[in-house]
Amino acid sequence: MSSFHRYFKKCEEFALCAEVSDGNVVEVEDASERYTLYQIVVKGSGRMGKIFENDYIVGDVNGVYFADLKEYLGHHTVFESFEPVHMYGFNTLDLNQDWDGKLIEGSFQGDDKSWLICFKGNPTINGKELRVMDYAKLENKHYDVQLNDAIVGVFTKL
């Protein structure tokens, strides 16, 4: 029998969720709970779509998969994993509040409307080593980044 575990953390201005399964799992999410703007898959593959529709997002992950899921807000969705999977969701707290999201590839200029989140690994940012699920509100300054093969996202409130 396959197992599926879901975790949720409400942060100051957003929420994070994480899903971990050993594969071959189907998960359904009700429209009233669908606040995920971005999905970050760090392990595994699967597909996701609106229930009873033919169009799916298929994620075949050899590295990392970052998906904009805004079109799924307010819709019933279904996710099927093809193999063991570990993924995160960046969620808005208010469906009327939009965010821009991206994975960083190196050093960058921050701003005070943004948050940084570590999804995998142990990057060093401005001399501080981060762990998985560490997050911080950014300031209007330069951030020196050594990724060390980590996966780090920056999300900006629009």
Model-derived features with residue positions:
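Jelly-roll (double-stranded beta-helix
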Residues: 1-158
